Each structure stands twice: as structure tokens, then as C-alpha cells.
């Protein structure tokens, strides 16, 4: 983006730092990762988990959720003020799975939040280390993105379920800060804004008084975040209109839906980071890796190297395919839920199949499922190549896409043309073209119509051998363009339910 100079890098957002040079950034990200690892090791000790149990991704997720809950100030305050029967606001917990006599058993644990905060701070040099907490949130968000569809949520806000490639980060909590905002897709932020506007329409006091003033500031800030993701002047000008509206209502909702649709072709900039489960960082720290000294980057080769030699297990339900479970977690680790499957397959060195063809449900296991009938297997999280993660959407061109997802959001910085089906997308733009933003709308539509399939629309570096740590010899893969590229194609993924 042109305004690069004024932006902090994603890693700086991630670590809450001010301007730093590359080495300092690598060190502070490393410090954050090391803190997560040390915390995980300590929790495994407190819970008396065996080495094998500590590598179980379901146990990792429970421990991660406990620390997020322990630090969720607003919810903790709410729980204390609105006590509900049988819930201790000072405690948090979840299922821990243990191997007993050759079978898996579930044990529900409860912990003092204060105790968990103590362990977390101790692992992070006495600090609250919010960056590490956000990092864990992004990992959970990436896992949700790969596991669930957001069809219902899209339909509820008046958007088209085929716009799912714009919904990255839709389950991230509001408190995830700048690092969280960077990884949110255009559709996610449009949806948050639409929800706000709808509340304002239904509740006369929403924008009024001291609370209303705070709401207004949040609204304008969110508008600016969304504006910053768009790469064309017309889209940004429309965002200015939405932000400056005295009394946001249906006209603004229309504009936001229009803008979200336009992002299927004129793609926004959305950051991608490889965030791994806490147990992976724990394993590395336990084996003597000093993240802060070595430095670490979420967008380079480091996560690939870490996954090359980490053994993580997962519980597998009786009718699930372990290879498919591995694909799901691999996609989550690299934030590749909306990436072109051909690119993902090339990097992974194994065919990555669409969600509808996966015989696996989510990673987490419901409390009413019978764990004794389950086995565990190793997740195959290694890759054949590595590639730099991207923060831009690339400009687009056309190509036949599918009935499920009609566009992709690139994760890896690899040259390719980006599939989308112009006819399908443009059909969404017939109709409403009047109102204050008509000239901008016309301009946006004109740009979309002139997007050409011949252009190499995403200029990327290419992929690299895992031995090529400095990214010196890019390999530009050639893709069979007749092939299906989107993951949620013809989909039957489960809906995300809070």
C-alpha cells in the first residue's frame, strides 16, 4: 500500500511495539511466542499431563481458552455483577483428555482465574503480555475460519453467503486490538458495522448521551479500519461517506453491502499470520529453543520450520479421516481458509480438498460425545515448500469459479491469477445505483467490469524450498487454471455457533 511509511508492521501490532527495526521485531515476536510456550509447559506440569497428553491439540485448546477467559476483563466483570446459578465467576476450566489404561478419558477441570493469570504473567516476565493473548485469539479465529461456514451470519446481515471469502476473522473478539483488526476480512468489518447501524435504527438512544458518544467513536474507528483495507479511491470515498453520516441508517447498510460485494473483485488488504497452537510453542521451548534469542516471524519461514519437526496429536472420531483432520489444522495454522486450493496444495505438497469433501468435523469435542470410542492420531502439519504470507488482496482478474465461494483471499505471496466468476459477481450489482454515492458506485462498477483475466493479477514472490531460509530462489508454480480453486465450494460445513 502507498501509505506504507505511516503503518506499523503487523509484527509491531502483534507485539504492541512502536517502530522497531527488523531484528527488534523478530526478537519481540520471539519473546511473545516464548512466553506462550513457557506458560503451556507450566500448565502441563500443574495439570500433571504426560508428554503425549500435552501434545494433544484438544488439551492445548482447553488451556488456551482458559487463559483467554482468565484475562477477559469485561466478561469477568459482567459475570460478577450478574451471577448465574452454578457458575463461579472466579473460576474457569474445560475438558482435559487423559490416556487411562489404553483409553481416552475426559476430565472436567476448574481453576482459579487468578491462578492462571499468575502462571501466565510468570511465563511472560511478570507482564500481562496482551500480544500473546491476541496471538492465541487469532489462532482460534483461523481454526474457526477453516472449520465453519458463516452462511447464517451473512444472510442475517443481508449479505450473500457466497461472500464467505471476505469473512476472515469473523469470530475474533472485539478486544483483539490492532493485530486482530489487521486479520479481519472486509466482510467481517462490514458485518460489524451493519450490526451497529441496525441497533441504532432499533434503539433511539444508541447514539445518544455519553455512551452514544463512545459508540460513535467506535463506529468511526471501525469505518477507518475498513477504509484502510480498500485499495481504490472510489471505495475509500464511499467509506468516508459512511463514516461521516450524521445518522447512519439503511442507506449506509446498502453502501456497506455494496462495498463488501465489490471486494470480491477489487480485493481489500487483509493480513495473514501463521498462529500455531500453544502446545507447538511449548514443545519447542521444552526442547531448548530460545525464541527471543533466535527471533521469530509470523509471516516468514519460522512457523513452517516449527511445524516440520513438531509432533501434535488429535482425537479422531470413529468415522473421521485423520488425513482430513490434518488438512483442517494445517489450513488453520497458516490462515489459509480462503486461499486458492491450488496454491495451498502446491505448498503443502499434498492435495488440499474442498471443505465439502472432508470427512472430518471440527477439532473440539462436545461434552456429550463419547471419548472412549475415540482414538488419537498424529496430525501431519508438514509442508513441501514455504511462502511468505501476504497482507494484500492483489488485484483481480476473472476466471471460472464455483457455486459455493465465488472468490479467494490470497494467503501466500505467490504469483497466480485469482479466480472469480465475473457474471456471478456482477449480477449482484444490478439494481440500486442512485443516492449520494451513485458516482462512486458507478466508478467501482466500472473498475470491476474492466478487470481482465489475462493480467497476472497477484504478483507474488513464489514459493521457496524449506532449505532456502533467506528466500533467495523463488519457484513460481504453474497452476492448472481449469481446476476448482475454492475451499467452501458446494459446501456442507457446519455453521459456526457461539
Curated annotation (Swiss-Prot):
- InterPro entries, from UniProt? Flu_NP (IPR002141)
Instruction: Give the subcellular location.
Output: Virion; Host nucleus
Question: Where does it sit, as one GO cellular component term?
Answer: host cell nucleus
Q: Which residues form the signal peptide?
A: none
Main location group = virion
Compositionally skewed regions (Basic and acidic residues) per UniProt: 8-22
Positions of short motif Unconventional nuclear localization signal: 1-18
Name the segments for region: Disordered. 1-22
Please provide, alphabetically and separated by semicolons, the GO molecular function terms listed in this UniProt record.
RNA binding; structural molecule activity
Presence of keyword RNA-binding: yes
User: Which Pfam families does this UniProt record tie to the protein?
Assistant: Flu_NP
Q: What GO biological process terms are annotated to this protein in UniProt?
A: symbiont entry into host cell; viral penetration into host nucleus
**Entry keyword Ribonucleoprotein:** yes
Placement of sequence motif Bipartite nuclear localization signal: 198-216
**How is the polypeptide modified once translated?**
Late in virus-infected cells, may be cleaved from a 56-kDa protein to a 53-kDa protein by a cellular caspase. This cleavage might be a marker for the onset of apoptosis in infected cells or have a specific function in virus host interaction.
Lineage: superkingdom: Viruses
Q: Which UniProt keywords apply?
A: Capsid protein, Helical capsid protein, Host nucleus, Host-virus interaction, Ribonucleoprotein, RNA-binding, Viral nucleoprotein, Viral penetration into host nucleus, Virion, Virus entry into host cell
- Describe the subunit structure: Homomultimerizes to form the nucleocapsid. May bind host exportin-1/XPO1. Binds to viral genomic RNA. Protein-RNA contacts are mediated by a combination of electrostatic interactions between positively charged residues and the phosphate backbone and planar interactions between aromatic side chains and bases.
What is the role of this chain? Encapsidates the negative strand viral RNA, protecting it from nucleases. The encapsidated genomic RNA is termed the ribonucleoprotein (RNP) and serves as template for transcription and replication. The RNP needs to be localized in the host nucleus to start an infectious cycle, but is too large to diffuse through the nuclear pore complex. NP comprises at least 2 nuclear localization signals that are responsible for the active RNP import into the nucleus through cellular importin alpha/beta pathway.
Q: Which family does it belong to?
A: Belongs to the influenza viruses nucleoprotein family.
UniProt-recorded name of the protein: Nucleoprotein
Protein source organism: Influenza A virus (strain A/Wisconsin/3523/1988 H1N1)
Q: From which lineage does this chain's organism come?
A: Viruses, Riboviria, Orthornavirae, Negarnaviricota, Polyploviricotina
Q: Which gene encodes it?
A: NP
